[in-house]
């Protein structure tokens, strides 16, 4: 599987396709575009039937191997097995199994239709972003070790992205995280999550201002390509394709767990709870 920039047609410099491991560490393309696959893999009915019997980690491997073709399958399988464990996603409700990773609960059933809730916030920081960030941390560490390289992650957050990224990257070899956040404008819970970390590779920077001020600084650095390359700067926000692919997995998991055959259809609705930020 190869990847090209969304701006490839307008930029000759970005025409050369990249491998998954390359775009994993690079984030945005040099021309400022997003990396996308040159083609999208198809999933057959037979594959869906087989996937119904898999654990979450096994399902993640089956989906990711369609996109990360430059990573040996044995290595990729080990990475998903390391990431999606009951110990990592242990913050389940009473009666739910942590081994399910994203357990489903039927809220309502009537006339052959069901309303089902899929839990995505059982990870270390109780945010749905743990689902992708935990895998991203392991992928980063793996790819950097292969290249004997280092990466400085520079990000901005108003809460959940920062804590999820830091808990995923803490202690990872070859990785340092520099996270900007607006001073006194996050929830007390998320502030405590981030600023209580003592890992030597995690750096929290409180900025006088609002989230947009933090984000503007990150964008300025990202747009300075020579500086970005020299300082080996990467990103963990949603422009990183690896994070998008990791999120694809729980949609498949939700569908397969909520249905018994491929003929059944499911409509997804995303519900996101956000805690209010303190007033100035």
Predicted regions span which residues?
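Active-site nucleophile and cofactor-binding loops and adjacent substrate-binding regions
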Residues: 126-128, 152-158, 236-244, 269-272
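Glycine/threonine-rich beta-strand-loop-alpha-helix active-site module
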Residues: 150-198
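Charged, compositionally biased N-terminal leader segments and the immediate start
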Residues: 1-31
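Well-ordered mid-protein domain cores that form the structural environment of catalytic cofactors
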Residues: 104, 108, 115-168
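Short coil/turn connectors at secondary-structure junctions
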Residues: 31, 112-114, 148-151, 172-176, ...
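Small/polar-residue-rich loop-to-helix segments that shape phosphate-bearing ligand pockets
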Residues: 180-259
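Conserved small/polar residues in nucleotide/adenosyl-binding loops
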Residues: 274-280
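Small-residue-rich anion-binding loops in enzyme active sites
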Residues: 37-126, 198-228
């Amino acid at each position: 599987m190869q990847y090209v920039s969304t701006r490839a047609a307008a930029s000759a410099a970005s025409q050369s396709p990249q491998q998954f491991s390359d775009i994993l560490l690079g984030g945005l393309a040099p021309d400022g575009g997003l990396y996308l696959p040159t083609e999208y893999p198809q999933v057959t009915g037979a594959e869906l039937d087989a996937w119904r019997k898999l654990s979450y980690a096994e399902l993640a491997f089956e989906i990711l191997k369609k996109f990360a073709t430059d990573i040996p399958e044995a290595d990729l399988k080990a990475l998903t097995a390391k990431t999606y464990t009951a110990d990592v996603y242990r913050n389940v409700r009473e009666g739910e199994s942590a081994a399910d990773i994203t357990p489903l609960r039927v809220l309502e059933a009537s006339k052959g239709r069901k309303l089902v809730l899929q839990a995505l916030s059982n990870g270390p920081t109780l945010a749905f972003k743990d689902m992708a960030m935990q895998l991203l941390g392991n992928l980063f560490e793996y790819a950097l070790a292969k290249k004997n390289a280092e990466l400085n992650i520079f990000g901005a957050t108003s809460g959940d992205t920062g804590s999820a990224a830091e808990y995923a990257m803490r202690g990872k070899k070859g990785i340092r995280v520099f996270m900007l956040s607006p001073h006194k404008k996050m929830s007390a819970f998320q502030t405590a999550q981030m600023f209580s970390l003592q890992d030597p590779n995690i750096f929290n920077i409180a900025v006088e201002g609002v989230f947009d001020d933090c984000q503007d600084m990150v964008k300025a650095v990202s747009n300075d390509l020579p500086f970005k390359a020299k300082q080996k700067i990467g990103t963990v926000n949603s422009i990183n394709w690896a994070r998008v692919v990791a999120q694809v997995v729980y949609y498949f998991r939700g569908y397969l767990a909520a249905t018994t055959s491929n003929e059944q259809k499911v409509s997804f609705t995303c519900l996101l709870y956000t805690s209010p930020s303190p007033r100035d």
